[in-house]
Amino acid sequence: MKGIVLAGGLGSRLSPLTKVASKQLLPVYDKPLVYYPLSTLMLANIREILVIAAPNQIERFSDLLGNGEELGLCISYKVQMKPAGIAESLILAEEFLDGSKSALILGDNLFHGSGLGRRLEAFNEIEGAQTFGYHVQDPSPYGVATVNDDNMVTALVEKPKYSESKIAIPGLYFFDETASCRAKELKPSKRGELEILDLLRSYLDDLLLNLEMLPRGTAWFDSGTFDDLHEAGTYVKLMQERTGERVGDPLEIAKIRGWVN
């Protein structure tokens, strides 16, 4: 299992800050945002990781993370010339994956919860695709899943104006080794992008898509706006003060797992 952090995008809702820095490099309390998705992959026991970023930002990520050696990781980098959809990341990562299963996480998503790492680690031997669900009040900003009484996915809709389902799909996905080939077969959407929901539908059509609700007590933040960044930062500060434990700290995770001294 290898990991992909998609740290591209224009971050237009965070302008003017994103005119000088990728949003994934902006601070969430005491750490850059990208530390949090990187930590999630590490909690899933994934140590080979590809960071995908825009041409004018890739060097900054490399300056921050290096080759991963200090974290017990092997980190490499790939340029995404322009935002062309989340699913394109599986195409860009094809050489890196080299037939491996993969975990894809969006660089602006923060996950935190007791036992989350152990749960995610269970998907390292996945057959098909694994996505997750999170109950939200307003699903309109997200990809949304409809499930039946057996918790099987019956429909996937991108940013619906109205939806009876309140199950948002967070930016974390596990795929088998066919993901890159499936992504290359997708056609661009009306907005000219290779959509992640279309990739998930490819698995759904083959009865190979599974959805699991994130464990009770898990927090998820999609940090795309100033309010989102503030809310996520407030959460991190509160949790660290309450528990005395660091949230989203790659070095601490590496030490706990014995990857570094």
Predicted regions and their residues:
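A structural signal for short hydrophobic beta-strand segments in well-ordered beta-sheet cores
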Residues: 25, 145-147
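Conserved donor-nucleotide/metal-binding helix-loop-beta segment in metal-dependent transferases, i.e.
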Residues: 113-141
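Catalytic-core segments of class I nucleotidyltransferases/pyrophosphorylases
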Residues: 103, 120-121, 152-254
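Short aromatic/basic micro-patch
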Residues: 27, 173-174, 259
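Conserved N-terminal catalytic core of the sugar/cofactor nucleotidyltransferase
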Residues: 2-5, 13-16, 26-27, 31-106, ...
